[in-house]
Amino acid sequence: MRYALGVEYDGSEFQGWQQLGEHGGPSVQASLQAALSSVADAPVQVVCAGRTDAGVHGECQVVHFDSDAHREPRGWMLGTTARLPPSIAVRWCVPAAADFHARFSARARRYRYRLLNRQIRPALYRQTLSWERRPLDADAMHVAAQALLGENDFSAFRSVQCQALHARRNLQAIHVQRIGEVVEVQVQANAFLHHMVRNIVGSLILVGTGEQPADWIATLLAGRDRTVAGPTAPPQGLVFIGPLYPAEWHLPAEVTQ
């Protein structure tokens, strides 16, 4: 039987989502598979909606797995969470259709990046916030970001290690706002390139400080040259909010579009 899980994790202590082999360092995937396999009393493999890098967090990562073990969804949720490290928790578990796929059934994916914007570095929440001491104009960042909307070639914002076959993505929404001392960037797209959100944020920061004009982002997008864009923002400020699926899959409301 196929199940879908919603998984929350603090990525600070992991080398990313993906299991990278025996000597690849701790991963969220390896921890989750070990816990599920213990509950199932048999090997379990999971497929996720979107892989995250080292230090990046997950608010509602969605995975699917198959198992012949007879367990109620609540049993999977509680039993698996009890076997996971404190930095990972299963938020929900539901039966899924046999043809549901955590990655390929997703219609969109959402990320949030949070920057503490003040002169003094953070003592609290430093694992879940990035820090920028220079004053940022969040309104200018928001205006500049709107140039990225729609289906475009995002070569200027992909990492050199990106293995995607092409750089075209459909960026459906991007919003920048200030909430007290925090500047927050929320992004939604059909899919993302490696480091795409962090590279966008790194470039928007240069607009926010006034080092670059608002129309610079549009120029970067058109130029498709990663070497002239801003630096990659640090990983700790980034959270994978989660994917969105059509209602036909009958998943919880937070991941249904």
Curated annotation (Swiss-Prot):
UniProt keywords, alphabetically: Isomerase, tRNA processing
EC primary class: isomerase
Amino-acid positions noted as binding substrate in the UniProt annotation, renumbered to this chain: Y111
SUPFAM superfamilies: Pseudouridine synthase
Reactions this protein catalyses: uridine(38/39/40) in tRNA = pseudouridine(38/39/40) in tRNA
InterPro entries cross-referenced by the UniProt entry: PsdUridine_synth_cat_dom_sf (IPR020103), PsdUridine_synth_TruA (IPR001406), PsdUridine_synth_TruA_a/b_dom (IPR020097), PsdUridine_synth_TruA_C (IPR020095), TruA/RsuA/RluB/E/F_N (IPR020094)
One GO molecular-function entry: RNA binding
Example GO BP: tRNA pseudouridine synthesis
Family designation: Belongs to the tRNA pseudouridine synthase TruA family.
The protein's role, per its UniProt record: Formation of pseudouridine at positions 38, 39 and 40 in the anticodon stem and loop of transfer RNAs.
HAMAP family given in the database record: TruA
Assembly behavior: Homodimer.
Protein name: tRNA pseudouridine synthase A
Organism, as annotated: Xanthomonas oryzae pv. oryzae (strain KACC10331 / KXO85)
Lineage, top ranks: Bacteria, Pseudomonadati, Pseudomonadota, Gammaproteobacteria, Lysobacterales
